[in-house]
Amino acid sequence: MEILVCVKQVPDTAEVKIDPVKHTVIRAGVPNIFNPFDQNALEAALALKDADKDVKITLLSMGPDQAKDVLREGLAMGADDAYLLSDRKLGGSDTLATGYALAQAIKKLAADKGIEQFDIILCGKQAIDGDTAQVGPQIACELGIPQITYARDIKVEGDKVTVQQENEEGYIVTEAQFPVLITAVKDLNEPRFPTIRGTMKAKRREIPNLDAAAVAADDAQIGLSGSPTKVRKIFTPPQRSGGLVLKVEDDNEQAIVDQVMEKLVAQKII
């Protein structure tokens, strides 16, 4: 079984600050981390590899050269190969352009392996820096394969996957044949830590770079020219004011109801 996992290096959102004038993210001095949902996606692939040693896991990331840090972390966790899609032409890509570029890279990697498609492509449900949850589904659309999003449990039998797909009311069970793209939620698993031995081996690994030409990407569909999305402003949500606490003596239920009704009438809610 051939599995590809898309991973991304993201700024630690706990440290991110917004420029109050430009309304852009201030990245200087902000540490970068392995996108948490992508770690869940990788752990799902590693669990399948634990159960079947014939499983091969390929990692793919798109970004600057420093994104190789998360690829090496993924190799240290147990992935077999890793590739970085990096090109100045990709700068400014929105989710549409990113999905297209990654799909082009996936096609090339599959062809290089002598296969038509990867059996399973795994992505985190979203990246914590953009929170769009669009790139995974966009890749599936570009490749013309089924997609199952928000996976909280994955079972593989033969060339079929059965997935518990998380939703607001609980979950639904969805089945699909290979090839399929699946996006992972946090409840899917608990990602393992890289081993010391794996970390040392990963440091010595050469991670190949792929540019736009290598994956036959159309310049009109990548970067700013291929990105119809225009970001007008980035901002932090305003802090909520504290809730109103109503107090009465002797657990007088009628007094509580009267106070609540008085407040609702005063605010013209009723």
UniProtKB/Swiss-Prot annotation:
InterPro entries: ETF_a/b_N (IPR014730), ETF_b (IPR012255), ETF_beta_N (IPR033948), Rossmann-like_a/b/a_fold (IPR014729). Gene3D superfamilies: HUPs. It holds the Pfam family ETF. Keywords: Electron transport, FAD, Flavoprotein, Transport. Its cofactor is FAD. Binds 2 FAD per dimer. One of its GO terms (molecular function) is electron transfer activity. Belongs to the ETF alpha-subunit/FixB family. The electron transfer flavoprotein serves as a specific electron acceptor for other dehydrogenases. It transfers the electrons to the main respiratory chain via ETF-ubiquinone oxidoreductase (ETF dehydrogenase). Heterodimer of an alpha and a beta subunit. This is Electron transfer flavoprotein subunit beta. The gene is etfB.
